[in-house]
């Protein structure tokens, strides 16, 4: 998957920090690919590797093209449902309003589709906040506290907050049935 994503050193660092940024949230959710988180962890690692696959594509077509590349790309180790899941994460990562097609609804459970949305919205939030850079993403954390999805940012980096970040935090919080909070 890393080869497909044409990962460079900057993207490798962002992938690692994306895992750290999302770990508390995703590990707290019940598994949707079996009885343990192991299969999901592997899929999420792949989704994080693919997080920037559409970065250079035209914004009007980015979601569809990136999804098709993930669905049909030359990589091994992913069965059809896994590819479909990764394709859905990628599509929603680039277009929040992407509606699952018959392909997704026939191959994935409603819980898996819901999880794909959660992962994609987490990637969207992280990318918006950090500009897809490891050094900036390290300065924030995501957690759940008292019914709130909390984005904590180091005080000296509060100026990195934008309306776009607030909006994406709100979308993710809504997906998780939580209120958004910034600290």
Predicted regions and their residues:
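Divalent metal-dependent catalytic cores for phosphoryl transfer on phosphate-bearing substrates
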Residues: 2-6, 13-142
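Extended, folded domain segments that form the structural surfaces/walls around functional sites
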Residues: 34, 179-180
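Short, charged/polar low-complexity linear motifs in solvent-exposed/disordered segments
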Residues: 74-75, 150, 169
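A short interface-forming secondary-structure element
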Residues: 148-165
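Short, non-transmembrane amphipathic alpha-helical segments
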Residues: 160-179
């Amino acid at each position: 998957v890393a080869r497909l994503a044409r990962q460079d050193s900057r993207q490798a660092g962002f992938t690692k920090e994306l895992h750290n940024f999302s770990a508390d949230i995703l590990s707290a959710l019940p598994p949707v690919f079996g009885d343990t988180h192991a299969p999901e962890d592997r899929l999420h690692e792949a989704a994080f590797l693919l997080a920037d696959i559409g970065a250079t594509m035209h914004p009007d077509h980015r979601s569809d093209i990136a999804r098709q590349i993930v669905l049909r790309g030359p990589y091994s180790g992913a069965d059809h449902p896994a590819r479909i899941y990764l394709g859905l994460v990628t599509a929603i990562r680039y277009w929040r309003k992407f509606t699952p097609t018959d392909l997704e609804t026939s191959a994935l459970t409603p819980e898996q589709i819901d999880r794909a949305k959660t992962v994609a919205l987490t990637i969207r939030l992280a990318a918006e906040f950090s500009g897809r850079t490891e050094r900036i993403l390290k300065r924030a954390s995501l957690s759940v506290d008292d019914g709130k999805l909390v984005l904590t940012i180091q005080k000296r980096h509060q100026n990195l907050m934008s309306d776009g970040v607030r909006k994406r935090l709100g979308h993710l919080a809504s997906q998780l049935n939580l209120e958004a909070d910034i600290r």
